[in-house]
Amino acid sequence: MTTGRGRTAAVLAALLVAAAALGGCGKIYPTDEPASGPANGVKADVQDVVVGFAQQQLQAPYFAAMQVRAEQIAQEQGFTLLFQAANKDPVVQMNQMQAMMSQGADVLVVNATSVKGQFEMMTQVASKIPVTYIDTSVPGTGMTSVQSDNLTIGRESGKITAQRFRDMGKDSISMVILTGPATDEFVGPNRRQGFLDGLTEGGVEYEIRAEQSGEYAQDKGQVAAENMLAGNPDVDLILGLNDSMALGGYNVVNGKPQYDSVYVAASADGQKEALALIKSGGCDGKYISTGLNSPSLAADEALRISIEVATGQRVPADFPAESFTKAVGIGCENIDEYYDPNSVF
């Protein structure tokens, strides 16, 4: 079994390799100043534009949905999309970004693998090519980021869950939490804290019995939930920091009499399978809430910015450091506004 400390050490080792690749005998790129325009000059026709999309992973449906939406946009507008996923490895991601640049990328969209560990790497990359971050950014680098307000999304979901428990006559609950991987230094912690803040704001006290990584994947979330429930069968809530892990937890407790009083919620994502459970269960269902985190909205905005820069409509300095997609909690009372069975995600 790999411990948290072991995973962290492995991540740090990988980042040291990346740093050596960048810095060893000098920097790959001669300046730290951010790129002021497209890497290969302004393209008058969008069909001449090449966009590199460096995704951190594809294991979770949320990230896979980003790829689907990005490919749809590229087909609709006619630009070339170079898409690579790094399996959460910063060294792999660096190599992929360099490969995209050598293949003629004018701009990059990047979902970073490590908020803290990629600063030097991304400073240098962003000096050569305009970088728009999506979902996870490296603060202080790149031209802008498009992401979810994870703290607010988590809080809104937590408030909905708090109200459900209060409706059941409970103002104090025990819970277990399904977390992200060791490299999840920003998104997951914000989702976690936001949800807990929402419980508090909603008038519910909580006790965290256990936390375990589900790697943002349903199958691993299911295993982690089984492990935690084995020692804590009487908890009130399984919280997943995304719907995929929460769905894994749902699979563990659904239909099992010993877990009749165990409910499930997610901090974020709004995955259609989770929304279907919220809709079918109604206000007495086992899957209580989640938060809107649309991969399509994020991809739309990140690619809009990238194309505007690549075609000279705007320059990198025109954009704020960060912008956020719509933040809202989703529960039984507003499910019809957000559930689309035909959605990509």
List each language-model region with its residue ranges.
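Hinge/cleft segment of the Venus flytrap/periplasmic-binding protein
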Residues: 12, 25-43, 47, 178-182, ...
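C-terminal motif of bacterial Sec signal peptides marking the signal peptidase cleavage site
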Residues: 20-24
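Extracytoplasmic "Venus flytrap"
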Residues: 32-43, 48-69, 73, 82-93, ...
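An alpha-beta-alpha
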Residues: 51, 55-57, 70-72, 157-203, ...
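Short beta-strand elements at the ligand-binding edges of bilobed clamshell
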Residues: 83-85, 138-163, 178, 280-296
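Hydrophobic alpha-helical segments within soluble ligand-binding/sensing domains
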Residues: 93, 146-173, 220-222, 270-275, ...
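Hydrophobic alpha-helical
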Residues: 110-125, 195, 213-277
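Flexible loop/hinge segments that line or gate small-molecule binding clefts
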Residues: 116-152, 168, 174, 271-284
